[in-house]
Amino acid sequence: MRRLILGVAAACAIVALTASGAPAKNGNGVMCVLHARLTTTNETTGSTSTARGHTQIKVRANGTIEFKTHILNQDGETFVAGHIHQAPVGVAGPIVVPLFVSPTPATSARHIRQSGVATPNAGTTGAALCTNPSAFYVNYHTTAFTGGAIRGQLH
């Protein structure tokens, strides 16, 4: 019985020592991989855009954010910017990571594919995105919907 108790205590100690509030990293220096489904129904701007899309975010241990976005742009709207904002569902929030902004050429292609590396604004860390992704959303803007055309919470 004493061995069983010592074994359980040792296992609990190991778990307690290895668990932390910081996001885990994989062997490639990636702290977490997040996704956002971009639609107008998630927008707070009253957007009637017909576009929809998906963004994948990889938060790297060095603080950079890699992103890949694909937007199906059925009506040829002109997309001019994309950001990560901090706010819960249904609330507009401040930009914390610029994904692309002017002078990046605006595009009205039917299939928009964008990828790149971004750096969070001062006061925001990649670890914050990993720890509480639903507190952040991805938002893409068009010339018609400058406040945001499509949006999705990170998860």
List each model region and its residues.
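Metal-centered catalytic cores of metalloenzymes
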Residues: 2-7, 12-82, 86-155
